[in-house]
């Protein structure tokens, strides 16, 4: 869409994967007893309690290879799976159990991994949102912000950190910082 308006910004697309485990202690990882969590280190891992699936979800954050929407494979990366499985066995051993399934997804990230939530400077009636690989958790808030931008051109929230005009989005060879 941005190309239609004469814009090209720096985005990196990676193929990520998540695994769902059927823990024999599933009640300990239910929504009522277990939080969404992030292991903020290098590498970074995150997980969700059992909700909607018959098991807890775990993944490495930005552990996948660069790709494009056209060239992605949907194939599970055994090395990425092993890193996640090893982490789970070491840090949450009672969450480990039979694998329900592993699936792939795409992250689309600006170099600074911050969201883009703004209108286009020369087209204030065009709202832009880029999720930076972790937007799904904020979908309802993004919907509210985008509807405010579409209806009034402004939001009740401070969107200055997420401006479309950030220099790093247009830098020729930006330093990529993908740590959350």
Locate predicted features.
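Active-site substrate-recognition segment that forms the wall
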Residues: 1-122
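C-terminal catalytic lobe of FAD-dependent flavoproteins
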Residues: 86-180
